[in-house]
């Protein structure tokens, strides 16, 4: 029997200390819901999880970017529909005044409406905006030196696409003459020419609207793909990082029992020197 070193107490204390640390770790996992709360819990798992989290955050924002792009196109297409309706009306008036039965006075009255409609085309072009960006003044046309509209549709660098919108002013649509005056229908011949100009303007608008529709559909598919990737990556990160609550509860119960038994054994070990004292008392 020895008294200077109580090895049983030291051993019991060591086991108790490690079990208490394990209980603290398990309780931390249960309180946070995360299996990995620091690099010490699982260094390689944390590294993989952080990479996945980077992609998850990027995918979520890319999805929002794509939806913003869809809103941008919807807004532009709505304004362009108004412009198309106006030019359709100009074309109808041109067909009407191409008929020779109208007097000059009649044509002047129709010209007033045509001029007003041309002015409305310019008003739409000047006031059509999205987040203070002018849509139809050539800012997003091909070859524009002013600016460009980029949609970033992925979680990583350079995963973006450029979108173009042609200039849709009355000048670009050739609804005004070289001197800036609106197209005239003062004679059947001029009115007949206006029909051709209206057709050309409508063709340009229809092509632009078709491009918008195709790009909108593309963005819609992109958004769906991003949502799917976001969901799958989040599931992958969850499997690595999240705690299995049932498993952690079982582990906590086991470790708490070990702590309680370790405490009891430490108390028993601390009583061993008393046996030496009793032996000495018999001398």
Swiss-Prot record:
Cellular compartments annotated: Periplasmic flagellum; Periplasm
Keyword set, alphabetical order: Bacterial flagellum, Periplasm
Entry GO MF terms: structural molecule activity
Major subcellular site: periplasm
InterPro entries on file: Flagellin, Flagellin_C, Flagellin_C_sub2, Flagellin_N
GO terms for cellular component: periplasmic flagellum
Domain of life: Bacteria
PANTHER family given in the database record: FLAGELLIN
Oligomeric form and interacting partners: The flagellum consists of two outer layers around a core that contains several antigenically related polypeptides.
Role description: Component of the core of the flagella.
Record protein name field: Flagellar filament 35 kDa core protein
Lineage, highest ranks first: Bacteria, Pseudomonadati, Spirochaetota, Spirochaetia, Leptospirales
UniProt gene name: flaB
């Amino acid at each position: 029997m020895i008294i200077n070193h109580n090895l049983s107490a030291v051993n019991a204390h060591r086991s108790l200390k490690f079990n208490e640390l394990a209980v603290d770790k398990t309780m931390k996992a249960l309180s946070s819901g995360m299996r990995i709360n620091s690099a010490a819990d699982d260094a390689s798992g944390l590294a993989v999880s952080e990479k996945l989290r980077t992609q998850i955050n990027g995918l979520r924002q890319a999805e929002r970017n794509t939806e913003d792009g869809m809103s941008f196109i919807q807004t532009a297409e709505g304004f362009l529909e108004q412009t198309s309706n106006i030019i359709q009306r100009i074309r109808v008036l041109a067909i009407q005044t191409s008929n020779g039965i109208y007097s000059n006075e009649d044509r002047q009255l129709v010209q007033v409406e045509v001029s007003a409609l041309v002015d409305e085309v310019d008003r739409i072009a000047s006031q059509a905006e999205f987040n203070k960006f002018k849509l139809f003044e050539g800012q997003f046309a091909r070859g524009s030196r002013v600016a460009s509209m980029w949609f970033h549709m992925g979680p990583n660098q350079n995963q973006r696409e450029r979108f173009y919108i042609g200039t849709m002013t009355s000048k670009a649509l050739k609804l005004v003459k070289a001197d800036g005056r609106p197209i005239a229908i003062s004679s059947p011949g001029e009115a007949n020419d206006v029909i051709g100009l209206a057709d050309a303007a409508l063709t340009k608008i229809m092509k632009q609207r078709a491009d918008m529709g195709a790009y909108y559909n593309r963005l819609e598919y992109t958004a769906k793909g991003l949502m799917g990737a976001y969901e799958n990556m989040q599931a992958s990160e969850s499997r690595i990082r999240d705690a299995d609550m049932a498993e952690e509860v079982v582990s906590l119960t086991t470790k708490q029992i070990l702590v309680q038994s370790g405490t009891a054994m430490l108390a028993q070990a601390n009583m061993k020197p008393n046996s030496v004292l009793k032996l000495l008392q018999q001398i």
